[in-house]
Amino acid sequence: MSVKILSVAKQLPKHTRETKDIIPFVKLWMQGQETRFQRKVLKLFEGAGVDRRYSIMDAEEVFLNSSFEDKNNIYVREVTTLAEQSLKKSLEKASLQPTDIDYIITVSCTGIMIPSVDAYLINSLQMRQDIVRLPVTEMGCAAGVSGIIYAKNFLQANPNKRAAVIAVESPTATFQLEDFSMVNIVSAAIFGDGA
């Protein structure tokens, strides 16, 4: 049995700035670091090929020395909204209702939610209570593709069913101000938030 994607939609968060407007925040963050290291980091941000950055929080909040718990609370609130808006757009494009979905897969590796975002979507969109759920977490960049593969396998095993895959990420929620590792820096330089 063949499986096909009926629609794709995205939802970006409301906070956005051009990279040139983020550089002053990066310079402040880098104060106290070795000059050569600072130049390297600035070059990385400027050369990342990312002209506009989207975030679930304003740049001032991202670079604020707040706890992981505080940022994760913002993550929970905002990614639920992004995921819901993205799913609603995709369902509308496909002329489907939330109750038409038999299998929901949510993908995220940038925050911690229990229950996961799929449970919130089922309630907020009044999806069927017998829907099959699969939260895919901690898989990094391969998670979105994995979610699509899981959906394909489910649909091939269950003809005439429908699945929704929602990938939502917010690396700004996991940005650690005290962490000057290249992993944290590269993540901040190249990744953005959205669903």
Describe the role of every protein-language-model region.
Residues 24-27, 41, 45, 59-64, ...:
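A sequence-level detector of short, solvent-exposed, charge-rich linear segments
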Residues 1-102:
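Conserved active-site "lid/cap" helical segment
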Residues 102-108:
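Short glycine-rich or small-residue beta-strand-to-loop segments that form or flank ligand, phosphate
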Residues 77, 84, 88-98, 110-195:
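Acyl-thioester C-C bond-transforming condensing/cleaving domain
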